[in-house]
Amino acid sequence: MNEGSNMKNVKILEGTYKIRGKDVDLSGMVFPLVQEFKVGAKGGYVTVDGAAIAGFPDRNIKIACDSPRSYELDTKSNVTQLEETDEQIVDRIRDRFDMLKDMTKAVKKGVVSAMIVSGPPGVGKSHGVEEVLDRYDTLSSLGGGTKYEVVKGAMSPIGLYCKLFNFKEKDQVLVFDDCDAVFEEPLALNILKAALDSKKKRTIHWNTDSFKLRNEGVPDSFEFKGSAIFITNLDFRDIKSKKLRSHLEALESRCHYMDLTIKSEKDKMLRIKQVTADGMLDAYKLDDEVKADVMDFIDINKKQLRELSLRTVLKVAELAVAFPDRWEAMAENTVMHTR
């Protein structure tokens, strides 16, 4: 935002920006100016800071315009304040999950060597990744391919070394789901840094004698050609610990970082409604009225729930199947904080 006196804003007189495939007229809107008019391969544009206004990408964007006369410099007006509509929030989050699927495909193919997926618990991060990998594994199993593996919980450095060795080939993927402790262990982090190095040849070494390696037939060095996905509830930008932040920065520099942009309770609730509308509860064979009642229960009681998540919706749906006449009372005692 433009609180500093030296920051220039620009008021768009005539200009458009493509949002989800549609040219949106931005006439009258005020943005922080990044770079004045230029002509590119697709015509003229002025570059502004899209992150300053809700509903626009969190980066610099190019607004299409015919000439410098299509906008005016404005040091007096404030940046336009917009609040995202529910539809815009759902579209934004849906776009991120579509990107997550595309990036997971690229990881599986070995085109992308590593990805970090960041988002709050219970919004479908793991499901989005595993759904894609399961589809590829069904095809690869016909040709004798090796399945990917999801690693959860704590892991020692030597355990990590052995796991990487077992999934070292190009078409293999290791998914580290909620394994944040591995980021804090210096030796484990150094192993990951070697595995995800940007060099064409990535060689990992274990430089101390180990009975475990000898016993499992694992060499003390090997070339790693596989890929890795890290699924975490951490938002790397919010980490306060300097030590952990430096560790995460070292990992982030070697990975693509996918932030699912679910930051608020409203974002999370709209994500839950979107996934439910897409058919998440169909397997429970509940009629539409009961499904709507389940969602109303979640929405009304969202501040009292033990966890506002897709998992909680599924728990309540299970109760609606098991106890058709008293599922709400059961849910009040199992998924809500007791007073």
Walk through the language-model features, giving the residues of each:
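Conserved AAA+ ATPase small/helical "lid" subdomain
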Residues: 268-269, 274-338
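N-terminal pre-Walker A segment at the start of P-loop NTPase domains
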Residues: 77-110
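Walker A/P-loop nucleotide-binding motif
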Residues: 109-129
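Loop/turn-to-beta-strand initiation segments
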Residues: 170-174, 220-229
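A short helix-turn-beta junction within AAA+ P-loop NTPase domains corresponding to the substrate/partner-engaging
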Residues: 242-263
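N-terminal accessory interaction module
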Residues: 7-81
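Conserved catalytic/switch belt of AAA+ P-loop NTPases
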Residues: 184-224, 233
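AAA+/P-loop NTPase substrate/partner-engagement loops
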Residues: 137-172, 180-185
